[in-house]
Swiss-Prot record:
The entry's keywords: Cell membrane, Membrane, Sugar transport, Transmembrane, Transmembrane helix, Transport
Origin superkingdom: Bacteria
Membrane topology: Multi-pass membrane protein
GO cellular component entries: plasma membrane
Protein's UniProt keywords contain Cell membrane: yes
Subcellular localization, as worded in the UniProt entry: Cell membrane
Membrane spanning stretches: 4-26, 33-50, 55-72, 85-107, 117-134, 154-171, 181-200, 207-229, 234-256, 268-285
Keyword Phosphoprotein recorded: no
Pfam family, one: Sugar_transport
GO molecular function, one term: carbohydrate transmembrane transporter activity
InterPro entries per record: Sugar_transport (IPR010651)
Name by which UniProt lists this protein: Putative sugar uptake protein SAG2157
Length: 288
């Protein structure tokens, strides 16, 4: 029971980042920079308490991973501007799950048993269906939704997904570091990536400083993800962490005023259910 409660914390922490950042405001580049500053602050605090051994390879690959992460996060913030948080977040999370699972299964042979392929392919099918319903719009309302530039949103989700999957593959399949040790080099890389997106014009504006809270939320989610994996197992921790899309959808509608027609509300619920079932199945696949 304790493990399940701990697993809820990453779900809420990561799932809230999108609507909290958009409630604070700022351009995507400012949101990314503010978030990475918060992550760097969190990483420094962790390092002061843990003081792990820091090797050259840890710094090099940690910084590289952080830069890749910043590409993913910046693209996600861009997509939120085009599509809204309640649409962009589930699409981004689903794309990462599908892409990451396929890379893991086909390139790194993470699926070796028949049951893994059966459950894994079923999960991916559910996630794709979830994609469809989460982004489906009421045709009668499309003329009123000119501010939601979905084509640009899908393009930004595409490069965001490449960034996130590359970062995940680097840390999970190529270089395996202690999470508490690599968090500082990674946070440095995240900041460097964010500064590149700002074209090296660094301004510590109020909106940037306020967005640091999302970086702290990211850090808290990471720590409790590790604790949940230790207490309840990786399958539970992974599945629960992916359910943050529910929080982002609800948060976008309640706190950002993103409107949905009755048809779209039904489609969103169907999409959420598919995401939940798909994420749980992928968690089960990881347990084999």
């Amino acid at each position: 029971m304790e493990g399940l409660l701990i697993a809820l914390i990453p779900m809420f922490a990561w799932g809230s980042i999108g609507f909290v950042s958009n409630k604070i405001g700022g351009r995507p580049n400012q949101q990314t920079f503010g978030m990475t500053l918060g992550a760097l602050l969190f990483a420094i605090i962790v390092w002061l308490f843990k003081q792990p051994e820091m090797t050259a390879s840890l710094w090099i690959f940690g910084i590289l991973g952080g830069i890749l992460w910043s590409v993913g996060q910046n693209g996600q913030f861009q997509a939120m501007k085009y599509m809204g948080v309640s649409v962009a977040n589930p699409l981004s999370s689903g794309a990462q799950l599908v892409g990451g699972s396929l890379v893991g299964a086909l390139v790194f042979h993470e699926w070796t048993k028949p049951i893994q392929f059966i459950l894994g392919l079923t999960a991916l099918t559910l996630l794709v269906i979830g994609f469809y319903f989460s982004s489906k719009r009421d045709v009668s309302e499309q003329a009123l939704a000119t501010h939601q530039e979905f084509s640009k949103g899908f393009a930004t989700i595409a490069y965001s997904t490449v960034g996130y999957i590359s970062y995940a593959v680097l840390f999970n399949n190529i270089m395996k570091f202690d999470a508490m040790a690599v968090i500082l080099p990674m946070a440095v890389g995240m900041c460097l990536g964010a500064i590149c997106f700002m074209k090296f014009r660094v301004n510590f504006e109020a909106v940037v400083v306020k967005n640091m809270i999302t970086g702290l939320m990211w850090g808290v989610g990471n720590v409790f993800m590790l604790l949940a994996a230790a207490k309840a197992g990786l399958a539970i921790a992974f599945s629960f962490s992916q359910l943050g899309v529910i929080i982002s959808i609800i948060g976008g509608i309640l706190f950002l005023g993103e409107t949905k027609t009755k048809k779209e509300q039904k489609w969103v619920v169907m999409g959420i259910l598919c995401f939940v079932m798909g994420a749980i199945l992928l968690g089960i696949v990881k347990s084999y």
